[in-house]
Amino acid sequence: MITVYSKPLCHYCTMAKQWLEQNGFAYEEIRVDTNPEARQFLINEGHRTMPQLYHKGKLLVEGGGQALVRLDPKHVKELIGEVDVGDIQL
C-alpha cells in the first residue's frame, strides 16, 4: 500500500490522491498537521513540501504529486511490485 503524507488545503495532495484512486491504487493518508511523528519523519528525510509518497518505507517518486501524475500507472505498478499477469509478456 502507498502512504501519502499530506496536509489540508493542499492542491497537489488532492491531485495525487485522485490520481491514485482513478488508477486503482490503494493508499493510506497520513496528515502531517495532526501527526507530529510523521511531520518529524519527513523533516528528517529532508522534505519540506507535500505530498510525499512512500511505499514500504521508501520514497516512491521524487517530486510528489506533480511527478506522480506524469507517470504511467504501469510504471508505478512496477515500482511497488504490483505487476498484473496481463502486463507480462512471455
Regions found by a protein language model. Give the residues of each.
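Short acidic active-site motifs
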Residues: 37-41
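Local sequence-structure signature of Cys/Sec-based thiol-disulfide redox active-site neighborhoods
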Residues: 1-25
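Short intrinsically disordered terminal tails
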Residues: 1, 89-90
